[in-house]
Structures are given as C-alpha cells and as structure tokens.
Amino acid sequence: MTGENTGDNPRRVLLKLSGEAFGGGKVGIDTTVVRRIAEEIVPAVKQGVQVAIVVGGGNFFRGAELQQAGIDRSRGDYMGMLGTVMNCLALQDFLEQEGQATRVQTAITMGQVAEPYIPLKAIRHLEKGRVVIFGAGAGMPYFSTDTVSIQRSLEIHCDEVLMGKNGVDGVYTADPRKDENAKRFATLSYNRALVDNLAVMDAAALSMARDNKQRIRVFGLEGAGNVTQALLGEEIGTMVSTAESTLAE
C-alpha cells in the first residue's frame, strides 16, 4: 500500500512514540533503537506519506513520578517536557543522517534548537515532504503526550494517530503478559476501550479522540518493519475507532 489516499490528498499521519521506546527500557537514549525507528520512517515518507511525530520524555523524567519524590508536579512536568526535546533532537539527527529533511517544533520557545509550534507552518513542512517532530508536550503541565498527540493530529488534519507500543502488538482483552488467554482486538470501539479501561492511552486523550472521531492504530514497535507498515496504512495491531469491537483471528 502506498502513501496515497483514495482521494487526491496524500496520507497524513501522526506517529506517537513513547520516551521509554527511545531509552530501550533504561534512562537516556538508546541510539540503536532510535536509529532503527528513523530508518523505518524514511521509506514511508518516500512513498508519499506525510509524517508528523510526537515524542514522550519518560526515558528522562515523568512529572507524576517526580511528584512522588517531593518535586512540585508542575515543575516536574516541565522537566519532562525538556526531556521530550532531547528525544526530538536525537530522532531529527538520525532522520537527517538518512537524508530525510526534518523539522522540530516545540510548545516551549527555544529558538536555538527548534521552531515554535505553528500548525500552519507544520502543515507546510509536511506538504514539502519534511518530517515534523513535536516536542515539549503541550507547553503546559498536567497534559500527557498522549493528549498532545490527539490534539496535534486534529489541528494539522491527520488521517489517524499511530501509537507505537513496547512489549505488545496491539490492544488485548487483558494483559497478555499476565493472562495467557488474552485475545488481541483487530478493531476496538472508543467506548469499549474507555469502559474496560484498556491500555490504549490515557482516558483524557481517548475521550478527545472519540469526541472528534480520530482513528488510532495501536501497534508493536519491536517487529522489524512495523513502523513502516503502520505509516503506510497496513492493517497491523488494533484499530480504535467508531467501529464495533472485533477480535483478531
């Protein structure tokens, strides 16, 4: 499948990557992992897919966890936002090493390393074949990068959000690491995900997606080529939408 939609408009997606993915399960950046992700993004862009990315910062800081250690929640969230920018710059570097023009836009102004977040400018970059990476979350505390991924996708008119997960290849009826009888959903309704508290994203982000009918595909990051397949629109993982829930065969 190519990056072209059925109409005249090219496919435009937002890829959500967790900070934990960048760290390979450790604090800091696992360059091998980030390089592989970059290498899998480029083929999809070359086939015409317009790719925006939101990156988390959990491999450096998490505001909620810092709060438990006695740090003010707002300040901890800002520390997490700065962590996302470090991840953005790392991914930008590896993408550019692959010859892919990339721009970083941040919700907190830091002109020496990134552009400010301007939706129309981001759209223009995408139309020119550049990858756009959004950093610093929403620029405000108490907003998760899951929520930011939905908000940004709506503002720049993405067809769907792609949630890359570690350790699972989609959304299951139960935690597959704890329940051997857990089944993967092929399709999942927003309401079922919310009512059953299934591991898609946080409730605020999922509610925003439901209210605006923004499709979400949840897939596993570990499999070779999975990022490329998801970007191209292949049916891997679990699609969360208004459709009825069905289990994978």
Swiss-Prot record:
It is found in: Cytoplasm. UMP binds at residues 57, 77, 138-145. GO terms for molecular function: ATP binding; UMP kinase activity. Keywords: ATP-binding, Cytoplasm, Kinase, Nucleotide-binding, Pyrimidine biosynthesis, Transferase. Its main location: cytoplasm. Its EC number is 2.7.4.22. It holds the Pfam family AA_kinase. Homohexamer. This is Uridylate kinase. It comes from Bifidobacterium adolescentis (strain ATCC 15703 / DSM 20083 / NCTC 11814 / E194a). The lineage of its organism: Bacteria, Bacillati, Actinomycetota, Actinomycetes, Bifidobacteriales.
